[in-house]
Design a protein with these regions (language model features):
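Active-site-adjacent pocket-lining segments in enzyme domains
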Residues: 1-98
Length: 98
């Protein structure tokens, strides 16, 4: 799975039978709270993706704002923002080729 930017929001609904996130303890990156707020949309959002994933146990790894940043944790490849899209694609292609 290779979400980037706000795509990891789709991971929030993936829970086990007890209701715990199946991504708890997994390393990933997502559009940061700082990027949400400096981008001008965060103050209008009822919740922030990065914060919510961390609250549910994901191990968020933030790179510099608005810069390419990719995290790979096994078969989970994630990119922080739109600037990371090409790097996510390259990492996914390399993972599939291995």
């Amino acid at each position: 799975i290779a979400p980037f930017c706000h795509g990891p929001a789709g991971l929030l609904s993936a829970v086990d039978a007890a209701g715990a996130s199946i991504f708890a303890g997994r390393r990933l990156t997502v559009f940061t709270d700082d990027e949400e707020l400096t981008g001008g949309l965060g103050e209008n959002s009822p919740w922030l993706v990065a914060r919510t994933l961390r609250e549910r146990g994901a191990l968020g790894e933030d790179g510099p704002a608005w810069r390419e940043h990719v995290v790979r944790d096994g078969n989970l490849i994630s990119g922080q923002n739109p600037q990371s899209s090409e790097a996510v694609a390259r990492t996914l292609i390399a993972a599939l080729a291995a």
